[in-house]
Design a protein with these regions (language model features):
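Glycine-rich nucleophile elbow surrounding the catalytic serine of serine-hydrolase chemistry
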Residues: 236-249
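A catalytic-pocket lid/entrance helix-loop region that shapes and gates access to the active site
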Residues: 151-155, 248, 252-353
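Short alpha-helix in the alpha/beta-hydrolase fold that links the catalytic acid
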Residues: 482, 496-506
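Alpha/beta-hydrolase fold nucleophile elbow
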Residues: 226-239
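Catalytic histidine-centered segment of alpha/beta-hydrolase-like enzymes
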Residues: 523-535
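Alpha/beta-hydrolase fold catalytic core
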Residues: 334-494
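Alpha/beta-hydrolase active-site loop
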Residues: 177-180, 187, 204-223
Length: 554
């Protein structure tokens, strides 16, 4: 799940625990040997490197009326940041002629133990392999694991707060084990993953070091489990979608690993398009345009529109045309827009959002996500959901200009965290003595600067919004057979569905490669799978995508 910048994501996080293993030792006191005796020297703290783990178990899941036996492996693989070499440099080696003073830099000391749960179908021939991860940044992958495709699924309320424990774990009839073997990965420092060593946050908390760690993990996994010749897929949700764009490009460019497909759920590749506080970037009006269809879908769902629209998809097509037509021209005019045209656009925005014309004019025709969520049902002191705008909850502060929390995250978080802890410890037999961290506070310290493909070693200025569209485009050009599937919910105000369409239509790729991209939309939110009927549709679409692109004739 969890979207970048979500306060509610952090609300379900446990307090951070120490993730480094230290051993403090001292030599025993030296015997008094007279005047020549030297005082003992303290060795200080010594970092004990992580060791890989693997705990195997067996289970069965029924999908489509067929029982599938599987082996589950819960464990960790050890990854290192860029620049690390498995052959340590000899400190006594003299630098080569012309080398920098002091020779080559020493190996980075930071490392990560990345936690994963892998599911392998028992028996049968070669199988596709899909790597799953959520986003954040700073989120573990319990959301996709327990809510979408793992063999066990947590039961939650569809559009209301799930009652407190006990929670129900059931057979997941929408598990993707019928189409692919699966690997669910926790990002460094999240879930049961741990980081340690000097500058560990710098080594793993950023667009590029995070992607490098995932690419390293995937390479190690393919070796450990002998899966180099398997059809390979990435499945990322939310921040996991920009991660996928960078990872697929790194795998193909730096490691010569071609993938069969990339599956994106709730996509954001260009952060300049985020509907959260676009007022901080005046002159860039696209976020207001690409979020407008989601505002319309939300107002339609809550019956806030002045007119009836019996077919949601037909209505949204109309709104999309307005957003990229008359609305785009009005915003581009800026202060040159006439009063007559301004009033006409405000009236049309009222028709599509349900917000009062006076409010829209006061907002200069530009309404950001937090303000929309606070005001759509504000007359009843109700806050509208961010991750899933079908959800509602009482205002924390009825006088606030913007929404203070996300009712959907508050409604589901406890069920998911409790279910995964129960499942991991009792059924996967992993985690004794370890704290599970569903999310960690990395967003404000995350390094969003990014080195673009083909730009040498110079990183993108951190003052620019992160944009990884060139990475996905580069991967598609390097591997013209790479297929991409975009999945999105109509009621997602964190990563609006039309934003994903806009990004894909503007990838810098030849027109012929646009045919490698397919789109699937759902009457659901950011966590499409939180609605059981949408989960079934998502399963069917993804399974079909894998079967069509795996080159196995399945």
């Amino acid at each position: 799940m969890i979207p970048f910048g979500s306060k509610s994501c952090l609300a379900v996080a446990f307090a951070l625990a120490s993730c480094t293993l230290w051993a403090a030792t001292r030599e025993p006191p030296a015997q008094d040997k007279g005047p020549e005796a030297e005082p003992p020297k303290a060795e200080g703290h010594k970092f004990e490197p992580f060791k890989p783990e693997a705990v195997a178990s067996n289970g069965s899941v029924t999908v489509g009326g067929h029982a599938i036996s599987y082996q589950a492996i819960a464990g960790t693989l050890i990854v290192h940041p860029k620049g690390w070499d498995d052959v340590p440099r000899d400190p006594n080696e003299k630098p080569a002629p012309g080398a920098p003073e002091g020779g080559e830099p020493p190996n980075p000391t930071a490392e990560a133990a990345m936690f994963y749960v892998a599911y392998f179908k028992s028996g049968g021939g070669p199988r596709p392999l899909t790597f799953f991860y959520n986003g954040g940044p700073g989120s573990a992958t319990l959301w996709l694991h327990m809510g979408a495709f793992g063999p066990r699924r947590i039961v939650t309320s569809t559009e209301a707060h799930t009652p407190a424990a006990p929670y129900a774990l059931v057979n997941n009839a929408s598990s993707l084990l019928d189409a692919t073997d699966m690997v669910f990965i926790d990002a460094p420092g999240t879930g049961f993953s741990r980081i340690a060593g000097k500058d560990k946050e710098k080594a793993f908390f950023g667009v590029d070091p995070d992607a490098y760690a995932f690419a390293e993990f995937i390479s190690e996994f393919l070796t450990k489990y002998g899966r180099w010749n398997s059809p390979k897929y990435l499945f990322g949700e939310s921040y996991g979608t920009p991660r996928s764009a960078v990872v697929v490009n790194q795998l193909e460019s730096d490691r010569s690993i071609d993938l069969n497909g990339v599956i994106l759920l709730s996509q954001i590749l260009s952060f300049d398009l985020s509907p959260d506080r676009p007022t901080g970037n005046p002159g860039v009006d696209l976020p207001y345009q690409t979020v407008l269809p989601t505002y319309a879908a939300t107002a339609w769902y809550h019956h806030k529109l002045p007119a009836e629209h019996p077919n949601l998809e037909t209505f949204l097509t109309e709104v999309e045309q307005f957003a990229m037509g008359d609305y785009a021209r009005a915003l581009a005019a800026g202060s040159d827009l006439s009063a007559t045209d301004r009033n006409a656009i405000a009236a049309k925005l009222h028709d599509y959002t349900g917000l009062p014309v006076e409010y829209i004019l006061k907002a200069d025709l530009r309404i950001d996500g937090g303000e929309f969520r606070q005001n759509l049902q504000g007359d009843g002191n109700i806050t509208t959901g961010r991750l899933d705008s079908r959800f509602s909850g009482p205002d924390l502060d009825p006088l606030s200009q913007r929404a203070d929390y996300d009712p959907q995250s508050s409604a589901l978080g406890s069920a998911y965290v409790s279910a995964f802890n129960e499942y991991a410890r009792k059924e996967l037999h992993y985690g004794e003595g370890k704290m599970f961290k569903p999310s960690i506070r990395t967003f404000r310290t995350w390094n969003f600067s990014h080195q673009l493909p083909g730009q040498g070693e110079g990183p993108l200025s951190p003052r620019q919004g992160t944009n990884v569209m060139p990475d996905l485009a580069n991967a598609m050009k390097l591997n013209p057979n790479l297929k991409v599937q975009l999945n999105a919910g109509y009621f997602d105000l964190a990563t609006p569905f039309y934003q994903g369409i806009y990004e894909m239509r503007h990838l810098p790729i030849p027109q012929s490669l646009q045919g490698n991209i397919e789109y699937r939309f759902y009457q659901s939110g950011h966590m499409v799978y939180a609605k059981e009927s949408s989960l079934k549709q998502l399963h069917d679409n993804v399974a079909d995508f894998i079967r069509r692109t795996s080159n196995t004739g399945g």
